[in-house]
């Protein structure tokens, strides 16, 4: 299932060093919100996230939020952390990601997407040729029914992915 396989994995977004982006020529960092930057419907970022965002902005990288949530939900969080956003993205469909690339003036090869879900963030990134997909571990267990179901669907895919990368490391 190559479309569900991330290009790279980190435990949390705060574990990704700025040098990672520079080494790969990545200039546009597209970020998921829920369970990547904050918990669901929470206006406060997880510990260390604001500092991570500020450090990447200081490195002259462009960061933006891409979310399937409504503009009202995304706007309140985006304003708090100082980022612009594209809402109603309909991930894994790629038109939201394409809109973000066009809005900020970067090619797919200069773009990465960071998120915690295989079936939205990673699949969406992998469906747009050239985009680097980065999976991060969710910060918290899912509380919502459908998201818990999706996590059970992700589990066997992630087991195979981690077995493969551990075999090669």
Describe the function of each predicted region:
Residues 1-31, 38, 42-43, 47-113, ...:
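Asp-based, Mg2+/Mn2+-dependent phosphohydrolase catalytic module
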């Amino acid at each position: 299932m190559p479309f569900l396989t991330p290009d790279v994995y980190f435990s949390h977004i705060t574990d990704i060093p700025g040098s990672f982006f520079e080494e790969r020529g990545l200039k546009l960092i597209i970020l998921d919100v829920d369970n990547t930057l904050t918990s669901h419907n929470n206006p406060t970022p997880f510990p260390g996230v604001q500092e991570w965002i500020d450090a990447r902005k200081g490195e002259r990288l462009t960061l933006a939020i891409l979310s399937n949530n409504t503009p009202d939900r995304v706007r309140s969080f985006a304003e708090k952390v100082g980022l612009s956003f594209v809402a109603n993205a309909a991930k894994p469909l790629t038109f939201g990601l394409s809109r973000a690339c066009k809005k900020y003036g970067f090619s797919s090869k200069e773009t990465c997407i960071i998120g915690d879900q295989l079936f939205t963030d990673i699949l969406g990134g992998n469906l747009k040729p050239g985009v680097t997909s980065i999976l991060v571990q969710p910060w918290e267990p899912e509380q919502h029914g459908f998201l818990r179901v999706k996590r059970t669907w992700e589990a066997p895919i992630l087991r195979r992915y981690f077995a493969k990368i551990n075999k090669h490391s």
